[in-house]
Amino acid sequence: MIEADRLVHAQPQGTEERDEQIDRAMRPKLLDEYTGQDDTRAQLKVFIEAAQKRGEALDHMLIYGPPGLGKTTLAMIVANEMGVNIKSTSGPVLEKAGDLAALLTNLEAGDVLFIDEIHRLSPVVEEILYPAMEDYQLDIMIGEGPAARSIKLELPPFTLIGATTRAGALTSPLRARFGIPLRLEFYNVKDLSSIVTRSAKVLELPIDQEGAVEVARRSRGTPRIANRLLRRVRDYAEVKHDGEVNKVVAESALDMLDVDVEGFDYMDRKLLLAIIDKFMGGPVGLDNLAAAIGEERETIEDVLEPFLIQQGFIQRTPRGRIATARAYQHFNLIQPE
């Protein structure tokens, strides 16, 4: 199964224009509208207020954590709270030094430059970024060959917000230049059900508390997945029921979508059962596991494993992955002694 085809995968999907408009409407615009991540929210309020009192640009910020938890949304909120513009790009898009220079030279004082997947910056672009972050200077080469010369351009104070799902993949010099590191965690059911309720209002979808909790419970602690499942539950409710969502309707819709009570789909169950059945519960090395389920190492490490480990279904050990007692219980299997 291709990762992008999964309802419960947390990467953004290519959607039609109307879905993109709905996604934008679902996003909170200010910190007071942002649900969950209480520690991060409290820290940001202090940092933003302090920067505003001093009349300075906010310090550079690194937001990291699993996909779908609101890194892009948080960057937009920071820009809104600071009352500045935001320019967005991603690491793979910035292929040449000139690509980054074009963005930096168009920033105004205090603006936010948001770079998603910042761990994928090329070394050439990263080298240009260091003096820009530290000294608000841009070192660029003019001309080629013997006639080439370096010139320095002064940049207005700006805030770089980098987002990544793989903080460990950042180089040490780049990571050290971020004054504000923020880790986003998976959401609990209570906070996620509040997000579902808010999104349902945007969709003009009647949903009761139990229905919202059921959607939240199967959303893998991830707002992006919750909003995607909510749209599919809405489709089911409009066709099979009277358009309203309660616990029974949500359960029926999500069962039809093959998303179980833990938020697992076919790929999650395939991974867990491979460890249990093919490798006797583990330990199993990542390469063997990837070959057994026909997936890439990176997909297992970055997409499948984080939630399964966080929820206690898989344990990582020096010798490999192990299925926990909770994994056996999920499939009503007896764990070997």
Curated annotation (Swiss-Prot):
It comes from the Bacteria. Residues 261-337 are annotated as: Head domain (RuvB-H). GO terms for molecular function: ATP binding; ATP hydrolysis activity; four-way junction DNA binding; four-way junction helicase activity. DNA binds at R297, R316, R321. Mg(2+) binds at T72. Transmembrane segments: none annotated. Residues 4-187 are annotated as: Large ATPase domain (RuvB-L). It holds the Pfam family RuvB_N. GO terms for biological process: DNA recombination; DNA repair. It is found in: Cytoplasm. It catalyses: ATP + H2O = ADP + phosphate + H(+). GO terms for cellular component: cytoplasm; Holliday junction resolvase complex. Keywords: ATP-binding, Cytoplasm, DNA damage, DNA recombination, DNA repair, DNA-binding, Hydrolase, Nucleotide-binding. Residues 1-27 are annotated as: Disordered. Its main location: cytoplasm. ATP binds at R27, G68, K71, T72, T73, E134, D135, Y136, R177, Y187, R224. Disulfide bonds: none annotated. Coiled coil: none annotated. Its EC number is 3.6.4.-. Residues 188-258 are annotated as: Small ATPAse domain (RuvB-S). InterPro entries: AAA+_ATPase, AAA_lid_4, DNA_helicase_Holl-junc_RuvB, P-loop_NTPase, RuvB-like_N, RuvB_C, WH-like_DNA-bd_sf, WH_DNA-bd_sf. The RuvA-RuvB-RuvC complex processes Holliday junction (HJ) DNA during genetic recombination and DNA repair, while the RuvA-RuvB complex plays an important role in the rescue of blocked DNA replication forks via replication fork reversal (RFR). RuvA specifically binds to HJ cruciform DNA, conferring on it an open structure. The RuvB hexamer acts as an ATP-dependent pump, pulling dsDNA into and through the RuvAB complex. RuvB forms 2 homohexamers on either side of HJ DNA bound by 1 or 2 RuvA tetramers; 4 subunits per hexamer contact DNA at a time. Has 3 domains, the large (RuvB-L) and small ATPase (RuvB-S) domains and the C-terminal head (RuvB-H) domain. The head domain binds DNA, while the ATPase domains jointly bind ATP, ADP or are empty depending on the state of the subunit in the translocation cycle. During a single DNA translocation step the structure of each domain remains the same, but their relative positions change. Homohexamer. Forms an RuvA(8)-RuvB(12)-Holliday junction (HJ) complex. HJ DNA is sandwiched between 2 RuvA tetramers; dsDNA enters through RuvA and exits via RuvB. An RuvB hexamer assembles on each DNA strand where it exits the tetramer. Each RuvB hexamer is contacted by two RuvA subunits (via domain III) on 2 adjacent RuvB subunits; this complex drives branch migration. In the full resolvosome a probable DNA-RuvA(4)-RuvB(12)-RuvC(2) complex forms which resolves the HJ. Belongs to the RuvB family. This is Holliday junction branch migration complex subunit RuvB. It comes from Shewanella loihica (strain ATCC BAA-1088 / PV-4). The lineage of its organism: Bacteria, Pseudomonadati, Pseudomonadota, Gammaproteobacteria, Alteromonadales. The gene is ruvB.
